Amino acid sequence: MLSALVNRVSDKVQVTVGVAQNVAAGENSGGAVDVTQTAGDATQTATDVTQTATEVVAEYVKMTGAGRARLVPVSYVDELLATLVAGGATVVEPLAGVPVEVCDIKGRAAAGELLVADVRTIGAEFSPACRLGAELAVAEDARVPGYVVVCMRKCCIPWVAEAVEAKACPAEDVTISATGAEEQASARVSRHAASDAAQVVAAYLACHPRVEAVRYPGLKTDPSFACATSQLVGGFGPYVDYMWKESPGEWHRFTATDEDARTQIINFERLG
């Protein structure tokens, strides 16, 4: 049964991977071609020990489609977010909820919402949030431990920019971690591998005889598919939510890792 089901997912996986590749190639309304980072790029970054904090910040400006970015001490982040929320902002994540959904950053921003995109969990390389319309994107990077990278949209609302600047430190004063480049590169490679594995697991569950429903943004049948293909870059994240036929209305979550997808499926079946 397991081997047959694993073999049956191949067509679905090809469709999903094809979409991810199209998105990475810039074939989406977000136009995010220049923010895609491959595993090779990440590995190269790991060897670049001469990077400065200023260069790290510039990297995030490019990835998120921002106009500028600042480093804010972690100890000030909650206070900064509280100030922004008090001023009418809404903090969102590109992937949220159970079952998982893609936040329509582009649509909500166009409708007039002031959005702060927290991309620390999914990784900034997956979401050009500022280009999509978020006023700010909050990211983290192992090369600058103790800080978050706060990216500001081009033509950022003045009071929002002022709130960020009030908490920010000059990048020139921040020292790069000696091991941070390798850690950050490894984290990015791991996130992409987990996303790839999740695509396989989602397609597998969609064929599973005991599964009633599956939610994964990379499946063509998913309600978030159109939004995902236009607003995410290089993958659809690690979260796969599913519902057993014997437990209608009860969602369960599978969080993929960077382990081989087949191994994860086998372990899932053993536990299930």
Spans of model-derived segments:
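Residue-level detector of solvent-exposed, low-hydrophobicity positions
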Residues: 28, 44, 51, 232-234
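Conserved C-terminal alpha-helix-loop-beta "cap" of PLP-dependent enzymes
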Residues: 199, 203-272
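Conserved PLP-enzyme active-site core in the AAT-like
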Residues: 2-21, 32, 52-209, 215, ...
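Long, intrinsically disordered low-complexity tandem-repeat segments
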Residues: 35-53
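Residue-identity detector for glycine
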Residues: 26, 30-31, 40
